[in-house]
């Protein structure tokens, strides 16, 4: 059976220097190739929402990105503001420092505060798996399952590494067959996307969506 790669893809542009023209191009590509969503920083949500109005492509906004180390109240506020501006999905970054400090209750409360402000808007929780042990990955995945979030997500693409097959498999095994798993960071070609899907990913975050659906090799510097 042929994989419909486009339906897996969150077409992504999160660079600090991304221009409005580049965001508009991202949205045009997403409409042309029927990607599931575009993923942008919250400041570009109004632009993306306007460009994608009337299309099937959803607008996803990152929150607390890329460090996840801001105040919980600020993350929750940003999520609500992004939704009010037109975001239809939210990708938040956990506070990795808190997790590594053993502040498990604070990490969970941080996620819950954002989830509560998302209401019916799907929330994806970014673990930054390259910085975590397997035990910590399982710990956060179990936390997210308990909080009934929509997805767990591997990476910001801004740290020391991106999605790895073994981490996606571990995340899928932990959350079970229903909850979403998003592989992001360093997924730049069709073969890698297929590996992640076979490992259990139900969404792919990438700046190389066009290359993936066309079977080409993207630039090595992409998200």
Curated annotation (Swiss-Prot):
A single Gene Ontology molecular function, please? deoxyribose-phosphate aldolase activity
Name by which UniProt lists this protein? Deoxyribose-phosphate aldolase 1
Q: Where is the signal peptide?
A: none
What function is annotated for this protein? Catalyzes a reversible aldol reaction between acetaldehyde and D-glyceraldehyde 3-phosphate to generate 2-deoxy-D-ribose 5-phosphate.
- Give its localization: Cytoplasm
The UniProt gene name for this protein comes to: deoC1
Q: Does the keyword Cytoplasm apply?
A: yes
UniProt key word Cytoplasm: yes
The parts of the chain that form a coiled coil are none
Known EC number: 4.1.2.4
Q: What is its main location?
A: cytoplasm
Tell me, which GO biological process terms does this entry list? 2-deoxyribose 1-phosphate catabolic process; carbohydrate catabolic process; deoxyribonucleotide catabolic process
Pathway of action: Carbohydrate degradation; 2-deoxy-D-ribose 1-phosphate degradation; D-glyceraldehyde 3-phosphate and acetaldehyde from 2-deoxy-alpha-D-ribose 1-phosphate: step 2/2
Q: Which reaction does it catalyse?
A: 2-deoxy-D-ribose 5-phosphate = D-glyceraldehyde 3-phosphate + acetaldehyde
Question: Which top EC class applies here?
Answer: lyase
Q: Which UniProt keywords apply?
A: Cytoplasm, Lyase, Schiff base
* A cellular component term, taken from the record's GO annotations: cytoplasm
Task: Please report which protein family the annotation says this sequence is part of.
Answer: Belongs to the DeoC/FbaB aldolase family. DeoC type 1 subfamily.
Q: Where is the active site?
A: 91 (proton donor/acceptor), 153 (schiff-base intermediate with acetaldehyde), 182 (proton donor/acceptor)
- InterPro entries named among the record's database cross-references: Aldolase_TIM, DeoC, DeoC/FbaB/LacD_aldolase, DeoC_typeI
């Amino acid at each position: 059976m042929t994989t419909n790669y486009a339906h897996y893809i969150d077409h992504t542009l999160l660079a600090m220097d991304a221009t409005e023209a580049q965001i508009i191009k991202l949205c045009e590509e997403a409409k042309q190739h029927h990607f599931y969503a575009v993923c942008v920083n919250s400041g570009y949500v109004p632009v993306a929402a306007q460009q994608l109005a009337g299309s099937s492509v959803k607008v996803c906004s990152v929150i607390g990105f890329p460090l996840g180390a801001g105040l919980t109240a600020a993350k929750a506020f940003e999520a609500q503001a992004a939704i009010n501006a037109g975001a239809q999905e939210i990708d938040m970054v956990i506070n990795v420092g808190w997790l590594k400090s053993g502040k498990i209750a604070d990490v969970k409360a941080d996620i819950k505060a954002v989830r509560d402000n998302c209401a019916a808007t799907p929330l994806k929780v970014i673990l930054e798996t390259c910085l975590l042990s397997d035990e910590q990955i399982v710990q956060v995945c179990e936390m997210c399952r308990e909080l009934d979030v929509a997805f767990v997500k591997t990476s910001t693409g801004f740290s020391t590494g991106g999605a790895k097959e073994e981490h996606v498999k571990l995340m899928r095994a932990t959350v079970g067959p229903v909850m979403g798993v998003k592989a992001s960071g360093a997924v730049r070609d069709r073969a890698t996307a297929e590996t992640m899907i076979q490992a259990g990913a139900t969404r792919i975050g990438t700046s190389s969506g066009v290359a993936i659906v066309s079977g080409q090799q993207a630039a090595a510097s992409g998200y």
